[in-house]
Design a protein with these regions (language model features):
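Active-site pre-lysine segment of PLP-dependent enzymes
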Residues: 1-6, 16-52
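Conserved core segment of the aminotransferase class I/II
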Residues: 34, 38-110, 117-119
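Anion (oxyanion) recognition and catalysis
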Residues: 4, 121, 157-158
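Conserved C-terminal alpha-helix-loop-beta "cap" of PLP-dependent enzymes
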Residues: 127-128, 140-179
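Conserved glycine-rich beta-strand-loop-beta hairpin in the small C-terminal domain of fold type I
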Residues: 85, 92, 108-117, 128-142, ...
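Glycine-centered flexible beta-alpha turn that most often forms the glycine-rich phosphate-binding loop
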Residues: 13
């Protein structure tokens, strides 16, 4: 409502939308109400859920006709709306026939996240894992160990071979976090 009031368009990156914990449901931003639908541009892709990132394809969903015209013009002006036939076929196949795959993938990811969380809670109790109901990524608060996750990430890489993303890559407020 605030975005609508001030004529702000919401670009909703929902690329991880199909990766949810078992029993959890993805709710598209544009489906929340008519206002959300009318001010939204939603970006989705099969790249995460079907491991198709190398095919470099995505979808842009724009329900509002005025916004859709602007998006189409922008994409076509810059010649970035030209997916190859293989990418289109792979995405269509994934979304049309991939329900069983998605269910098994989500269970597998959920179990892996549980293993990680159980290990951390038992062995590194000062780390705090931000609760998550979706995606395969975890956001970890390291403030009880250090204020600088970058140093911790470098240590983890050199001593264990584990590569994690420094939270500072996502803005100054992320400097005491890492993403795995």
């Amino acid at each position: 409502e605030l975005c609508h009031k001030y004529n702000v368009t919401v670009i909703s990156d929902e690329i991880h939308c199909d990766i949810t914990n078992p029993g959890k449901e993805y709710i598209p931003f544009a489906s929340v109400n008519d206002v959300c639908r009318d001010i939204s541009i939603t970006c989705i892709a099969g790249s995460k859920v079907f491991n198709l990132g190398g095919l470099q394809s995505a979808c842009v969903v724009v329900p509002n006709k005025f916004l859709k015209h602007k998006v189409e013009r922008g994409l076509n002006t810059d010649e970035v709306a030209e997916p190859n036939a293989f990418a289109m076929s792979a995405n269509i196949a994934g979304f049309k026939y991939g329900d069983e795959w998605v269910c098994k993938l989500n269970n597998y990811i959920y179990e892996n996240k549980k293993i990680f969380c159980d290990y951390v809670n038992k062995n590194l109790p000062k780390l705090y894992i931000i609760p998550s109901e979706a995606t395969y990524l975890l956001w970890v608060d390291v403030r009880k160990y250090t204020d600088d996750a970058t140093t911790l990430c470098e240590y983890l890489r050199s001593k264990t071979g584990l590569y994690v993303c420094e939270g500072s890559e996502y803005g100054v407020n992320g400097k005491a976090f890492f993403r795995i």
